[in-house]
């Protein structure tokens, strides 16, 4: 019975977090939009990114006014790895998957970070490809074979010793986690391009 309750709770938790990531809230006039389709990063911005991006780059994105932004600190709430051929591997609610670069950058803020060690980029791409199909880590626990987005990216670059950051939600301190700033503030990466951040 306890197992069944945990299973039901787990499914509800996954559904809640998935829906939370698709709701945009406007303060004035006050209204909500589910799964909006307009973003501040436009086609020209994406073309600028495509002109400079290289395989192994860490790609980060963020959104204005999304509910999940209240729970994920920083301007860049999602990350992945550009693996070449116009595709990004990242971890989302459905698990680790490969998507088109243009789809990845349907967002309001964007940043591309390049590892200073080119050899690390090659290893990170191989690791990212090997993790396709892994589950999303809804519990944000290390070492369980599932990955939240920044954990996935940091795992692919584990050879660089990516640093976890202190986090707070509503002023309440939580355990250290990988965040967008784990990459943007790291001396192991250099910024290639930043849009609307």
Please annotate each region the language model reported.
Residues 1-197:
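Cysteine-nucleophile amide-bond enzymes
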């Amino acid at each position: 019975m306890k197992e069944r309750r945990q299973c039901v709770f787990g499914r509800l938790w996954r559904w809640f977090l998935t829906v939370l990531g698709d709701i945009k809230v406007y303060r004035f006039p006050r209204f909500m939009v589910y799964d909006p389709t307009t973003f501040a990063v436009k086609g020209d911005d994406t073309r600028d990114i495509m002109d400079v991006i290289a395989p192994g780059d860490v790609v980060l994105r963020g959104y204005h006014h999304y509910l999940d932004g209240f729970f994920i600190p920083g301007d860049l709430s999602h990350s992945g790895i550009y693996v070449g051929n116009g595709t990004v591997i990242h971890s989302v609610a459905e698990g680790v998957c490969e998507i088109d670069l243009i789809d990845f950058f349907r967002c309001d803020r964007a940043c591309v970070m390049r590892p200073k060690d080119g050899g690390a980029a090659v290893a990170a791409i191989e690791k990212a490809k090997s993790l396709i199909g892994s589950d999303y880590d809804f519990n944000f626990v290390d070492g369980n074979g599932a990955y939240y987005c920044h954990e996935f990216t940091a795992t692919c670059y584990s050879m660089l010793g990516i640093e976890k950051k202190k986090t707070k939600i509503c002023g309440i301190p939580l355990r250290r986690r990988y965040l967008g700033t784990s990459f943007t503030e790291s001396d192991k990466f250099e910024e290639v391009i930043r849009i609307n951040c």
